[in-house]
Amino acid sequence: MIINHPSLDQKPTAVRWWICALLFFATTINYIDRQVFAILAPQLQTEIGWSEIEYGYIVTAFQLSYAIGLLMVGKLIDFLGTKKGFILSIIVWSLAAMAHALARTPIGFGLARLALGIGESGNFPAAIKTISEWFPRKERALATGIFNSGSNIGAIVAPLLVPIIALNFGWQAAFILTGLLGFIWLFFWLRLMSRPEENVSINAAELDLIKADTEEDLEKPTSIWKIIRTRKIWAIAIGKFMTDPIWWFFLYWLPKFLNTTYGLKLDKIGLPLIVAYLIADVGSVGGGWLSSHFLQMGWSINAARKTTLLICAILVVPIYWASGIDDLWPAVILIGLGMAAHTGWSANMYTLATDFFPKKDMGTVVGFIGMAGAVGGMLMASATGHLLQATGSYKILFVIAASMYGIALIIIHLLVPNIDAEKS
């Protein structure tokens, strides 16, 4: 008599993709709350009267607390689990986002950014850990690309939403109303999120798919001191230290660049920002899809990931010419292409973490590499403020943006010549 395994007769449910959708919306809200300040910066600079250096310090305050938060929160999420960790994170960052409405001085905004950085630092460690728990290896790059694209959607929604609120109800209302979005998301997270084996909506076929190439999470998380003694953690950390600052630069200075270079005010700045981030969104999903597609073609993990990273590094190079273009839209297209290359790069950098390390360590690993990126962003923010105050020119900043990815890829390859030999 033939006994059929129940899961072999079933079509897998798609609960994991609903979880991915929740991560996407969390990341979208994360970036809306982060972007409000940058969009309002030209107006606030006129109203409050801070200098380029002071603006750089305010941005640095966020980067500093974000870096510190990533180092601490990764271990906390490994301890609490993804569900509780995300709850704590989004409550803190939503309250901090609304607290910006109380600020009246550069110091006040700096304190609000410090609190926001601590809260928002939980998003990516919790999201990547969730991906490692809910997706088989072959789907992780695509799932990461999808949720990571929320960063671009958030940056698209913010220029649509913030000017309307600010022009009609004042800039304080823009911070308060966008800050409330996190509590709406929290309702769905509480109802839908659980571990795969505990979820009542998942069937045996999907659970088998998820568990096909993942280790059982029975051991305690590895010590961070043991993790940082490996070359593979430094490959990702250095890669993010060199390239995350480029993303932070565009997140916080693109509205000001458009304002100072092309004279765009709050009521006109939305469309160019939306176009740039729409292009960037294609890069996030496309970069994740391309890497997963290479694996499905039978490529090794090493070839799939590094080829995708190389393509992204090449596509970012044309951004070099953006600062010298007199016409608005060609510059926006080039910047959008560079941002798309970054988001494709970023999706694969996070996927490398799931390639290299077991899911029990994912919060710690993502926290550490995220901290490295935030430290790079902190240094970039401070240097950008001083550079713009001294020269008023963005040229050198675009040169840096165009060159960092290729250099970072060389370092990654030297540290980890064969990803397949290092995979978890």
Please place each PLM-identified region on the residue numbering.
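Extracytoplasmic gate region of multi-pass secondary transporters
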Residues: 37-38, 230-287, 342-346, 350, ...
